[in-house]
């Protein structure tokens, strides 16, 4: 079983939309990897009210460092945080799934 980090656009989406996209990402990742995955919880529903974007990115990169693979959801290219996560995965040899 591989540990899976999911990078996805979240701005202007409801919690329900985010969760639905994550479920789809998990199914695609399982097909691509050919095995079950343990999802790393990078959806910060209980983040501090005054948390800035850089706070979220720092937490995400910390979690990404523990991943066996990273899935990049549709539209990731248009979001700064997702692009930084992608660059980190690429530079540190974490397999990327799309």
What are the functions of these language-model segments?
Residues 1-98:
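Conserved catalytic or regulatory cores that recognize and/or transform ribose-phosphate-containing ligands
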